[in-house]
């Protein structure tokens, strides 16, 4: 690539990569489908609200970079990505880059889970291997952020939009992972309380049945 991408351009490329695998029957994408994919409320960070005009303008720029190709042979203009060829990387690396472009910084484990529909990685080590290769390219395509205090794992970020604010992203990652850890702890507590309630209910039923037996009362419904 001859220049860094804008956030809108990165979103468009990420959507095209994603939809190639998730909705192959409608790929390449029409403008309407592409805009809808860019503006999804789920699996997107940040959430965007792009207009047709904004997407078309970005597509023109991406076409000049050979990252997006315009399909032919259809009454509706359709678009497809060319990311792997432009960067000279395999499909597995393309899947990781797209997931980072769509969801923001993530750990290797998160990337493996989130990119499953685009590419199945055997394990987290496989993900880390492709990330290391992308990081060693010239220029680097991804960066491993420093593991922040309190964070369980280091996160990765793509560099297709240029340099990033490492300090800000590291702090944000720590807060996110700590929040995730707190949610896990709360869920474990709720499960423990649920088990305790079930045990108490079982004990009460046993006591009621024993009392009924002593009184000669039949508790079974007629």
Swiss-Prot record:
Protein species of origin: Leptothrix cholodnii (strain ATCC 51168 / LMG 8142 / SP-6)
Family: Belongs to the UPF0502 family.
Coiled-coil blocks: none
Protein name as catalogued: UPF0502 protein Lcho_2066
Domain of life: Bacteria
A Pfam entry, by short name: DUF480
Disulfide bond annotation, renumbered to this chain: none
InterPro entries, A to Z: DUF480 (IPR007432), WH-like_DNA-bd_sf (IPR036388), WH_DNA-bd_sf (IPR036390)
């Amino acid at each position: 690539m001859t220049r860094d991408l804008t956030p809108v351009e990165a979103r468009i490329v990420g959507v095209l990569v994603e939809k190639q695998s998730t909705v192959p029957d409608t790929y390449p994408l029409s403008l309407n489908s592409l805009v809808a994919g860019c503006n999804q409320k789920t699996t997107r960070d940040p959430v965007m609200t792009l207009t047709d005009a904004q997407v078309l303008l970005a597509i023109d720029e991406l076409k000049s970079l050979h990252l997006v190709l315009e399909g032919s042979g259809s009454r509706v203009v359709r678009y497809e990505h060319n990311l792997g060829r432009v960067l000279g990387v395999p499909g597995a690396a393309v899947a990781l880059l797209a997931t980072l472009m769509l969801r923001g910084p993530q750990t290797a484990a998160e990337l493996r889970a989130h990119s499953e529909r685009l590419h199945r990685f055997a394990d987290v080590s496989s993900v880390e291997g492709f990330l290391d290769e992308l990081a060693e390219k010239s220029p680097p395509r991804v960066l491993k952020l420093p593991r922040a205090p309190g964070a369980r794992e280091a996160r990765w970020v793509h560099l297709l939009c240029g340099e990033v604010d490492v300090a800000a992203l590291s702090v944000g990652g720590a807060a996110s992972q700590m929040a995730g850890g707190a949610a896990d702890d709360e869920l474990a507590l709720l499960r423990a309380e649920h088990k305790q309630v079930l045990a108490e209910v079982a004990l009460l039923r046993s006591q009621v049945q024993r009392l009924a037996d002593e009184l000669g009362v039949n508790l079974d419904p007629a």
